[in-house]
Swiss-Prot record:
InterPro entries for this protein: CD300_family_receptors (IPR050671), Ig-like_dom (IPR007110), Ig-like_dom_sf (IPR036179), Ig-like_fold (IPR013783), Ig_sub (IPR003599), Ig_V-set (IPR013106)
Record PTM: Phosphorylated on tyrosine. N-glycosylated.
Function: Inhibitory receptor which may contribute to the down-regulation of cytolytic activity in natural killer (NK) cells, and to the down-regulation of mast cell degranulation. Negatively regulates the Toll-like receptor (TLR) signaling mediated by MYD88 but not TRIF through activation of PTPN6.
PANTHER family: CMRF35-LIKE MOLECULE 8, POLYMERIC-IMMUNOGLOBULIN RECEPTOR
Tissue specificity note: Expressed not only by natural killer (NK) cells but also by T-cell subsets, B-cells, dendritic cells, mast cells, granulocytes and monocytes.
Gene Ontology biological process: cell adhesion; immune system process; intracellular signal transduction; negative regulation of B cell proliferation; negative regulation of B cell receptor signaling pathway; negative regulation of eosinophil activation; negative regulation of eosinophil migration; negative regulation of fibroblast proliferation
Protein name per its UniProtKB record: CMRF35-like molecule 8
Principal location listed in the UniProt entry: membrane
Cytoplasmic side: 202-299
Source organism of the structure: Homo sapiens
Matching PROSITE patterns: IG_LIKE
């Protein structure tokens, strides 16, 4: 899984093409020199002295520019193309100078995929307090020179491949240890994003409500009119169902007899004599009262 990362690290100059670790030592306040060999094809290239890289690139302390020497504080470097080696000198040693260093050749990217380097372990031991002042002075001015035999590029590449496997394991451990932190940061970012979205939504709703209130305040009369209650009487018209026309009902007929008012009665004393029958026969017969009929219909 991490093989592409290991290959990428092999392409970075100054990383992971190491020879076997060499150890040099010097007293506190003294100095020491380290002689680092290189191949013939690296004669014109720049050489450097650096701390091992923490991530990708190593932290170069001092580097040559051509054949001229270079100094950076208490550390100096000088190239000797005739001897196919360069020398690094550390002066006025302190306990903080102890540790692992690399002396390497800065190869161009297109010529080589890795820098051939030699790992050097520097140890600093305290100066003996039982020495005489003359001995202490001699210790301070003493110089320890360590020369390493040349190491071929093939050996460097093989050792670098072995070391890259260990670097790969260390990288996996670092990533695994930092994975919970990355997941926590991702969860925090998601929570912040959700919170920002909710806040923006609430502000948008408030803005819409504020716009509605401003429109009502601009038209107070219209707002008052709209707020009043209006009542109206609604009369519902009942429309008959569209059914077949009902047959007309029979007309009820009522009959009544209307008689003219009778004349008032008159009483008289009548004396019948022999001529009565004749008079009665001669007297005209009274007509019967007329009867009027009318038809009253109930609608």
């Amino acid at each position: 899984m991490w093989l592409p990362w290991a290959l990428l690290l092999l392409w970075v100059p100054g990383c992971f093409a190491l020879s076997k670790c060499r150890t040099v030592a010097g007293p506190v306040g003294g100095s020491l020199s380290v002689q680092c060999p290189y191949e013939k094809e690296h004669r014109t290239l720049n050489k450097y002295w650096c701390r091992p890289p923490q991530i990708f690139l190593c932290d170069k302390i001092v580097e040559t520019k051509g054949s001229a020497g270079k100094r950076n504080g208490r550390v100096s470097i000088r190239d000797s193309p005739a001897n196919l080696s360069f020398t690094v000198t550390l002066e006025n040693l302190t306990e903080e100078d102890a540790g692992t260093y690399w002396c390497g050749v800065d190869t161009p990217w297109l010529r080589d995929f890795h820098d051939p380097v030699v790992e050097v372990e520097v140890s600093v031991f305290p100066a003996s307090t039982s020495m005489t002042p003359a001995s202490i002075t001699a210790a301070k001015t003493s110089t320890i020179t360590t020369a390493f035999p040349p190491v071929s590029s093939t050996t460097l590449f093989a050792v670098g491949a072995t070391h890259s496997a260990s670097i790969q394991e260390e990288t996996e451990e670092v990533v695994n240890s930092q994975l919970p932190l990355l997941l926590s940061l991702l969860a925090l970012l998601l929570l912040l994003l959700v919170g920002a979205s909710l806040l923006a939504w609430r502000m948008f709703q408030k803005w819409i409500k504020a716009g509605d209130h401003s429109e009502l305040s601009q038209n107070p009369k219209q707002a008052a009119t709209q707020s009043e209650l209006h009542y109206a009487n609604l009369e519902l018209l009942m429309w008959p169902l569209q059914e077949k026309p009902a047959p007309p009902r029979e007309v009820e007929v009522e009959y009544s007899t209307v008689a003219s008012p009778r004349e008032e009665l008159h009483y008289a004393s009548v004396v019948f004599d022999s001529n009565t029958n004749r008079i009665a026969a001669q007297r005209p017969r009274e007509e019967e009262p007329d009867s009027d009929y009318s038809v009253i219909r109930k609608t």
